[in-house]
Amino acid sequence: MSLRAVVLTLFPEMFPGPLGHSIAGKALETGAWSIEAVDIRSFATDRHHTVDDSPFGGGAGMVMRPDVVDAAIAASWPGDGPLVYLTPRGRVLDQALVRELAQAPSLTLLCGRYEGVDQRVLDERGMLEISIGDYVLSGGEAAAQVLLDAVVRLLPGVVGKTESLEDESFERGLLEYPHYTRPAEWRGRTVPEVLTSGHHQKVSDWRQARSEEITQTRRPDLWARYVAARTSLDRGCGQ
């Protein structure tokens, strides 16, 4: 069973874009997932194809109309997966949420523009609001591509080795350890000796230690959650 992705956007020509290349692109070719870009503007009913209007209460910018957006959703939503609105105020996308979304048979993503989308259609449709970070983009298209790339990688058979996924940043609650390849010496910099020792347990221990060190230094928020989870697990095992 493949994932069906539907993207509601004012710029359908932006898709698949980078998703048509590399891992996600190969998965498209093999049928692991599909993508349909729906032009929201085609659901406008006036001769100017108007999709936005000025906000009630005043203020800068324009707001996407609920009637137009809802018509696009009604015509395009497969009905068996979450409706997602990409917005800076949403739940922050993390690996746990990516894993959750990867279990869905379909994902319908609404890409906002201007000042955003009329709140009424978001409430009416019970949309899941997701953010890819604490910054503002010109629209939701780039965010949709980020979300889909993260999700597609977790689909069965898309990434060759399960170990590749398990070792990545965030999968174990830690940032990923450093990687090295040939040549063994480059510009006076050598590969850590333990990695060429052939001792698998020592290599594993080194990688774990580096992951912990990097996480503690660069992402103290992740480190705190990791320590709390590990402490809770240790207590549970001791009961």
Curated annotation (Swiss-Prot):
S-adenosyl-L-methionine binds at residues 112, 132-137. It catalyses: guanosine(37) in tRNA + S-adenosyl-L-methionine = N(1)-methylguanosine(37) in tRNA + S-adenosyl-L-homocysteine + H(+). It comes from Rhodospirillum rubrum (strain ATCC 11170 / ATH 1.1.1 / DSM 467 / LMG 4362 / NCIMB 8255 / S1). The gene is trmD. It is found in: Cytoplasm. This is tRNA (guanine-N(1)-)-methyltransferase. Specifically methylates guanosine-37 in various tRNAs. One of its GO terms (molecular function) is tRNA (guanine(37)-N1)-methyltransferase activity. Keywords: Cytoplasm, Methyltransferase, S-adenosyl-L-methionine, Transferase, tRNA processing. It is an enzyme of class 2 (transferase).
